[in-house]
Amino acid sequence: MKKIFQYIILAVVTIVMASCTSDIEETTATTGKSNVQLVVGEFPAFGDSQTRAIGTLDEGKTSWTEGDELLLEMTSKTLGTKYAAFKYNGSSWELASGELSYKEDEVPTFPHVYYAPNYKWDAGNLVLKEGKVAGTDEYIEGTAQITPNGEAITVKFSGATRNYSRLRIATMPNKPITVDTEYFTPAGSSDMEQKGNYTLTSDEKGNACLYGTFENNSEVTVKYRGATLKTYKFSKETENAKSYALDATVISAKSAEEIKSAIKQEVANSKTAIILNLASDAGDNEFKTIREAFKNVQDATIDLTLIGCKEIPADGLKELNALKSIFLPDVTKIGMNALSRCVYLEEICAPNVSTIDERAFAGFIMLEKVTLGELTDVRGEANSGGGIFDDDNWTPYIDLYLPKNQEVMKGEFDENSNQYIWKPTGEKYFATPDYDNGIFLGYQFNSVKSWE
């Protein structure tokens, strides 16, 4: 006769956390004793140190929740090795797939039991689930054994050792971020990546996590829609079972007064790379405050990133001599004269902009690089004094970057608006002679390239 298991009794020992010593280190995990057999026991949490109050403290997952899975491997003399996944339904563990069976007069063993949300069994091997990426969740191995009466399996994580660390990235709540890594070994993998790229979404507290090992001199760069929020280089290899916190938070400044205060503080702290999270509907009053706040700042010193706002209104950042570069990851519309006569500006990056009004980028003498989104509405005729750039005096020195799906733009005068308007034709721009010759919107550029 053979036994088939449909449930698991869980006995879990909480992993106790200690404080940290490294510059961004948060916690140290060691094992303790608190053994109680329960249908659901405590999850072996990382914890979060009170000594590193970066962002909103987050100890991570602390208990089993509905939908959690455990992956078990069982071996018996007669029936061999079996594999199964058990899923937690909120009150008990149920067999989700596979089978665990053995002859009643034998005592099976359990070579492996995993909590690894990104993985599943496939022909006896752990493989990534579709759409999952190693390093974006836990990979914990516990132990399991048959109970003396043969009625259940007891799974323990009391001796579980994480052979990886956690990097908690504190940033804006509920936002997609990308994380570029160097010399990183994801949890569950033995292959170190010289260069990696991860797409994460922060939770409502603004936290997103990577699980794995960073080598000495490993570098991490956190970006939001291409805008760099934080770059950090590790001064030593991360330690197993420790949690680290990386501060990629952004100053939230919704009102004019908050904007004024934030810029004043950043300038007082000698910051030159300034990132502000504005309201999506930030308008004339907020941008007037930005101009005034930078009025007495040294020319050509500020790399400004404005997150959240959807539009730069007419004259919004006009004649802002402090600007050296500007990044506008969420902006879809740039108004008339919005950035005109920012004479020391060297780079403009607006990868989601689709609408640009007359003379938005006029009056530049230092501009070298412009990155734009897929344009659908551009106002102003080139070389007429009313185009988005100055006449051909300066555009031949500019490298223009467009998305690969950009269409050819055709311009004509519109009597209703009394403006010259460029609209897409349906023809792919990067398959035309104008692309080869560096011509776009009637302007001659140093080069035109795809940024995708």
Label each PLM-derived region with a short phrase.
Residues 290-294, 312-323, 334-344, 356-367, ...:
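Core hydrophobic positions of leucine-rich repeats
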Residues 246-251, 397-452:
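Extracellular/surface-exposed low-complexity segments
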Residues 207-211, 219-226, 373, 390-407, ...:
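Surface-exposed substrate-engagement region within the catalytic domains
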Residues 2-10, 17-265, 365, 452:
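Sec-type signal peptide cleavage vicinity
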Residues 275-280, 299-311, 321-333, 343-355, ...:
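Structural signature of tandem-repeat unit edges
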Residues 86-88, 119, 144-146, 198-202, ...:
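Assembly/interface hotspot detector across virion components, adhesins/toxins, and nucleic-acid enzymes
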Residues 251-294, 451:
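N-terminal segments that cap or nucleate solenoid repeat domains
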